[in-house]
Each structure stands twice: as C-alpha cells, then as structure tokens.
Amino acid sequence: MEEHLNRLVDHIDGALGAALLNADGVVVHAVEPGKNLRLTHGLSEFGLVAKQLTSLDELSDLGEPLSFKFDSSDRTLLLRPLGPKYFVALWIKATHDALRAQFQLRIVSADLMALV
C-alpha cells in the first residue's frame, strides 16, 4: 500500500501527500514527504463528505461518482472512491496540474483496489 501511495506522490509535481482512508473517514495509511504539513488532520471530514456524495447515486440519476475535487487558495485535494469502503486522497499545490494528478490517481487507484 505504501509503495502505491509513494508512487503517486513521486510521479506528481507539486504533490504534498497521499492517503488511503476508509468510508468513515479514518486514515488507514498516509504518505507525507513534507511531514510538517500535517495534511491528514481534517481529512476525516473530507472522507465523510465524500461518503455522503457517493450516496447521491442512490437518490438521483447522476450516476456513480468517479472522483471529487476540493480547491483552496494554496492546495487541491483529490478524492477517488475505491469501491464502497475506501477512498484514496491526493493533495497537490494549487499551482500545479490537477488534470495530470487526476490521471495518475486513476492509475494508482486500480492497483490499490486490488489490495483493499
């Protein structure tokens, strides 16, 4: 698991960290190269929001969500469901390419799904 999260962070310019969390928002494993950022704090709240958003599929005709993007002035958080019980999260600096990060997140998500 750590290998896949490290690969994700290593392949993205401006990556600040990556994490695997369960559907209740609990961080199962995190990789933060700049450990002083403490990115995992508050991540549980994003996990709970993502869980609620994935339930929209049951209430509407939107279809199953594939990913979520939360932007702030200094960073972007990307979340991608790994089935009904897990999410993978990736933080990048706001000034970097979120589309490339989403692409890499999709690739690594396939590998992580085999582990969870």
Q: What residues fall within each predicted segment?
A:
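Non-catalytic interaction/Regulatory regions outside core domains
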Residues: 1-17, 21-23, 27-116
